[in-house]
Amino acid sequence: AASAVWGPSSNQKMIKCGYYSGNGSTTGPIIGVGFEPTTVILKGYSVTGGTAYWYIFDACKKFEAREEGAAWIEYNDYWDKVSGQGIIQQKRTGFQIRGTSTSLNENGGSYLYIAIRGPMRVPNATYGDKPSHFFNCAYGTANTSDVVGSFPGAENAPNFQPDFCMLRKPAASSYQYVSTRKSGYYYRATNNYSGVDTQTTWMHWAVEPGWGTDWDSTYFAWMWKSAPGLTHVEYYKGTGSQQTVTHNLGATPEMMMCWRLGPQGSPTYTAYWHKGLNGGSNPENYFMYAQYSLAQYDVNVWDDTAPTSTQFSLGSQDMVNKSGDEFSMVLFASLAGFQKVGYYAGNGSAGNVINCGFTTGSRFVMIKRTDTGSSNWKQYDTTRGLSSSVSMVLNANDYTAQSDDDFLRQHNTGFELNTSDAEVNASGGNYIYLAVANDPT
């Protein structure tokens, strides 16, 4: 339709058709469509030789925010998928042509495009949406297919395709890795100061359902799918000076997780922001390392500015804004019945219930004390064991294998602290958390 009639307020576009002129350069034309496309279809209609393929790029195969990679289908050929470097780049409000071939970007050539938007609706139980449609945690299946992922979606979410994943070996000493669909094969360890690395075989996003290839049952993954008002992955380039970055979460972020993508092998920390830092007072002046540490005061990380519903701010700190480097940023927000980003003060007594507004308990919980350095990033989930009798913990910041610390119990409204231990419930201690709900029964 010519008018913007889609979306929650019936004022957004779902599809945009148009054309562009090629310039023959690897810094090809930037095509603004007014939204972040997940699928782009291209066709040259006035080029040398008079013919050009139909190209289909989409996020399910390999349509990245990074400049380097893409996979596509040539619609009028017999190949099922072709991969290449520097062909097309996803942007927050459109896309940029990076290839120089006659089929995509001949100098003076004319090309048409069709750009299609991703999900626009905020998850809502009224329409049958469930937490497991947007989050899953599972052991690997050792699937070696490049079509079906090693880590599957939940049983009631057969088409689950995550956009952000964390991965490790629960039963052994192990790194904990993070990766995103937008960064492709790039990943890094949150429990290590070393830089990013690449893995073109295992870090495989072009599968459905699930994620990854050839991960066996000794590996475990936590997986989030982007959804408006819930979770979203952003990619940006550092400037070395103050900058604001527009985001597409569709809500004000309450937690942000950031890491540098390059250069490959360059040491770097993973940085967190959370609305509960400093007990919720001026949290924009603080950040957390993904390490065994307390909240750090530094106005040069988030530029002394809290995120808004449309952008987040960055200061001059290399950790989040080194000039010329690429960064991944994962944004989280609370959504009733699906996910809760919160904070609490410990009371020093077992039985302390943290009310997340859920009705059937928590599928996943991450907790970190912020006012002392002697605490871990503690992770719990129902697949490995979170119930009325067990709480299997993995610390995101260290290498140790999982164990039953007996700290948490399930509670219908969220989770219960079954201990007075200072890591999760010291009297007067400040804690931040991220919790994902169980599906309603």
Identify the meaning behind each predicted range.
Residues 1-441:
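Surface-exposed molecular-recognition determinants
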